[in-house]
Amino acid sequence: MDGQDDGGDREGAGSSCPQDGTDVSGRSGWDIPDERRERYRAISLASREAKKRAESGDAERVRPVNEPKLDPAGLTPLKARHGLRALSLFSGGGGLDLGFDRAGFTHVASYEVLDFAADTIRANRPDWTVRGGREGDVTAVDWTDFRGRVDVVHGGPPCQPFSIAGRRNGERDARDMFPEFVRCVREIRPLAFVAENVPGLAAKKFEPYVRQTILEPLGELYFVRQFTMEAPAFGVPQDRKRVFWAGVRKDANAAEFVPPEPTHDWLHLSSRRKTRPNCGGETALPKTMGAREALGLPDTGHDAVAPTIRSTLTGPRHTTSIVNSAAAARRWADIGMWPNGVAASRERASRFAAKNGHFRLSVDDVKVLQGFPG
């Protein structure tokens, strides 16, 4: 991946756990010949100079500023407040928090141990209660203080212990926080809970873990449903699949939770997949836009959902690259997009040419591809 990060910002641009290829450990890969090291250094310096020119406004536009066709707010219509209150754990960039907010829930608090992620939520929702850093460490919280004040607990515990990207050590991984999520639910006893994670956690390898850590302790108090959902089936132009656990308290006199049905058809965008959704044929559902169409880019004759966007919360690289594997890099190239150095704005991206001439993404573009409302 010669110099593909373009010497970009050292801030996060992605928002989720990887599918593969990002659990980096050790420094063995850094032992490279001096000649190649010098070549990388020259590429990096040239990229930084080009970036400086783009950020200063001195560089000319290499393309028009794109105007997205997809408005993600239309995928999650804003609903009236109904009085139910939601507490967020492992909040990250606030995706679940925003979803529950738009669904009419009153935000109680967000807990996120990484300061910069908590700062992101605060910047976008300054009126919310956000606990970051030490305050966001869920292992140190007595959740009984929230009993009677929270109706739903939701969160996505760190996925690295279960992702195919890593060693999949499960409960032996210090980052396994599912027991803390379960502790929170049992101490607060909300009316309902929702947890999500990578599909790897639903694999046979982790069946005993899921049963002993999630289903049995929560099943004492809740009717629990496990199911999977794919983002493109709900109009999001990104290849993202997640497993969910949703529970409704047994004494709540509420109907059993029913997973949502797909709202969009994406058969026309699934030619690269091993299994094809909606394989019964055409449906009456609206079609999910491909990534190019969603971002308002010219029709090249080929479009597809974007590959799973890499989280910059994983691994030691701290770059604005959102590519998570060589296979994903090829898929980005197929749709003419450059994922290795996300620009801070569309204006800057329009002045900062990618090495291969492909469309350089901006933070706002990545938000659209992930379904984040503006």
Predicted segments, located by residue:
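C-terminal target-recognition/interaction regions appended to catalytic cores
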Residues: 2-43, 50-55, 72, 286-374
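Core alpha/beta nucleotide-donor-binding catalytic domains of modification enzymes
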Residues: 40-43, 47-192, 199-212, 216
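Residues at the C-termini of beta-strands that transition into short coil/loop
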Residues: 90, 111, 137, 228-230, ...
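Residue-level signal for pocket-adjacent positions within structured domains
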Residues: 133, 157, 196, 224, ...
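Class I S-adenosyl-L-methionine
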Residues: 141-152, 160-335
